[in-house]
Regions:
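A short SAM/SAH-binding and catalytic strip from SAM-dependent methyltransferases
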Residues: 95-108
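Short alpha-helix
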Residues: 156-178
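A C-terminal cap/extension of S-adenosyl-L-methionine-dependent methyltransferases
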Residues: 175-236
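A short glycine-rich, Lys/Arg-flanked "PGG" loop and its adjoining helix->strand segment in the class I
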Residues: 109-121
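Conserved class I S-adenosyl-L-methionine
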Residues: 1-31, 44-48, 65-68, 72, 124-149, 155, ...
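A short acidic, Gly/Pro-enriched loop at the edge of an enzyme's catalytic core
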Residues: 84-96
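Class I SAM-dependent methyltransferase SAM/SAH-binding core
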Residues: 34-85
Length: 236
């Protein structure tokens, strides 16, 4: 099991702590039906959709993540698949959730087009992603060692909000809600030593300049959460 899989949704993940309540608040207001958790990871949103009464399908490209999701939710239908080729028929779901995944996709259009394909007219797409401003002091994180033994990188594409609109609106999506939850202020004592980081992340600026990084990032948007609705006329 990879390190990201082990710690992805463990307590203390600030991004998830900030993102998850907003996503759940949006999901609380949607009609119950068939829901797709696209890039479901370990199934944190899958589980909540089940609690709300949805029939849920989970899709992820990572076997490690899916193993955790299946262990967590053995009665849910999970598929190993890429977001560009969802294993679902046209117009087969009422809601699509895609959480903290599109930052790893180089081109939004084909993925959002797949979401539009599987959504029924009038269906909802809920997307969360890392905010562009959150990347200023945080480059792409090193991940598990690659074939040569050196830490590999998981590519990240940080986008302005206009990029989501440029990709979504021509496909027939309408914006119902957009939220940019902010990082809570934090204070560090002058002599506070930063927590140790794994060796493959030891170069990150947040670790070496904690006070300056905290001052720059305090009260800045850390995530963006979109609620789009597919236009029934445009899609049908």
């Amino acid at each position: 099991m990879s390190v990201p899989t082990q710690h992805y949704d463990a307590p203390g993940n600030q991004m998830i702590d900030i993102e998850q309540p907003v996503v759940r608040r949006i999901l609380d207001g949607l009609p119950v039906g068939t829901a797709l958790d696209a890039a479901c990871g370990t199934g944190r949103h899958t589980a909540y959709l089940r609690e709300l009464g949805h029939e849920v399908i989970g899709v992820d490209a990572s076997p490690d993540m899916l193993a955790q999701a299946r262990k967590r939710l053995p009665d849910v239908d999970f598929h190993e698949a890429d977001l560009h080729r969802l294993p679902l028929p046209d117009r087969s779901v009422d809601t699509v959730v895609c959480a903290l995944a599109l930052t790893h996709v180089p081109d939004l259009v084909p993925v959002l087009a797949e979401f539009a394909r599987v959504l029924r007219p009038g269906g909802s797409l809920v997307v969360s992603d890392a905010h562009l401003l959150a990347s200023y002091l945080r480059p792409a994180l090193a991940r598990r060692p690659g074939p040569d033994g050196r830490p590999s990188l998981l590519a990240e594409y940080h986008r302005p909000l206009s990029a989501y609109l440029a990709a979504a609106l021509p496909l027939g999506f309408q914006v119902r809600q957009c939220e940019e939850p902010r990082r809570p202020p934090r204070s560090l004592a002058p002599d506070t030593a930063p927590d140790p980081l794994p060796a493959d992340m030891s170069w990150e600026l947040l670790h070496w300049c904690p006070e300056a990084s905290a001052a720059a990032l305090d009260d800045s948007p850390v995530a963006v959460i979109w609620h789009f609705q597919l236009d029934g006329v445009r899609n049908g």
